[in-house]
């Protein structure tokens, strides 16, 4: 069977647009679908490049005085060499990998134990090698902006540039934010422009609220907690 995705949310909405016997042809440019969905080839990861350039543009317009580096890497699916080289060259205080994650809200994918819906917000990785302090900062920004985050639990690897970034130098505090995507690695990938805009807003707010005194070292945080705990006991 050939699955036709128009971006509609119900049978009634679909039948207003197509009917049995309609002729279909391949569309080789991008196509806007219903409910603010975008279909195009290579959204993995051209949509990530767009998000990063738009974040940089807004950060500049807002005159946010922070050092922000954007890298479009090569070799993410193979050796990770682009991410390794860039991380060593820049040595960032922290890093966020931006990739895509498989959407499960299609009628032929019912073998998932979790849900990732297009238009329901960015995917935030929950993993042992995702820096917990950076994770909390992202969650706090999302709450402030009323942006829903869809958690994705990863064990050992995420199969993205994050797996290489966090191992460089003395260890780079890292996280992974993903854009929900249907039909990954096909010529008709689909994403939600609502999710795209929310990720842009989330990253801009995160950058704006970064401070040069911020620590992403969990051991430093534990020292502070231990001190507070001891002071509480003395009191």
Regions found by a protein language model. Name each.
Residues 1-235:
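N-terminal hydrophobic/helix-forming segments and targeting peptides
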């Amino acid at each position: 069977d050939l699955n036709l995705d128009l971006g509609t949310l119900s049978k009634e909405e679909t039948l207003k647009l197509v009917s049995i016997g309609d002729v279909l042809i391949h569309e080789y440019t991008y196509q806007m679908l219903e409910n603010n969905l975008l279909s195009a080839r290579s959204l993995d990861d051209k949509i990530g490049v767009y998000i990063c350039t738009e974040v940089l543009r807004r950060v500049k317009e807002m005159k946010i005085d922070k050092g922000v580096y954007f890298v479009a890497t090569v070799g993410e699916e193979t050796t990770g060499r682009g991410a390794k080289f860039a991380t060593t060259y820049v040595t960032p205080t922290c890093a966020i990998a931006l990739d895509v994650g498989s959407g499960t809200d299609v009628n032929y994918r019912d073998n998932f134990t979790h849900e990732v819906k297009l238009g329901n917000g960015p995917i935030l990785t929950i993993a042992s090698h995702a820096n917990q302090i950076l994770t909390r900062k992202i969650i706090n920004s999302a709450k402030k902006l009323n942006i829903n985050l869809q958690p994705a639990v990863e064990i050992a690897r995420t199969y993205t540039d994050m797996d290489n970034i966090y191992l460089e130098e003395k260890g780079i505090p890292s996280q992974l934010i993903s854009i929900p995507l249907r039909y990954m690695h096909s010529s008709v990938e689909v994403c939600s422009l609502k999710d795209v805009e929310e990720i842009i807003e989330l990253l801009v707010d995160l950058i704006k609220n970064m401070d040069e005194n911020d620590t992403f070292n969990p051991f430093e945080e534990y020292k502070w907690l231990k001190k507070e705990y001891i002071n509480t006991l003395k009191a």
